[in-house]
Amino acid sequence: MDHAFANIQTGTWAAVHGGTARILGNGTDALIFAGRSVEIPRREGWSLSVFSLSDQCSGVTITGTKYECADTDFYNTFCLGVSNVWASDTAVVQIKEGIAMVMLSKLKAGEHI
């Protein structure tokens, strides 16, 4: 777990400096970015979660998913965007300000959200 956390911190550094980090694991795919939007094509059998890595992500808008939100604030002390799924061919996660991580997780056989 120490290396997983180190990878997230390194991804945060990349986002602060204008980049986007991608972390791949066994059944997990994460994107770390700041102050912009990302489009994520539908993945059957996967869930989608959004986390604030900075103290606050403001202006969070999530569309194309079962649970959407518009111009919402996410905080790193409260999990608001966990375990979502696609409702269209593409999910869009927009962050006006702050550093976010979108984590895609492969669902186990028979698992549904």
Protein language model regions, located:
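Anionic-ligand-binding alpha/beta catalytic cores of soluble enzymes and soluble regulatory domains
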Residues: M1-E39
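Long, charged alpha-helical interface segments
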Residues: N26, F33-I113
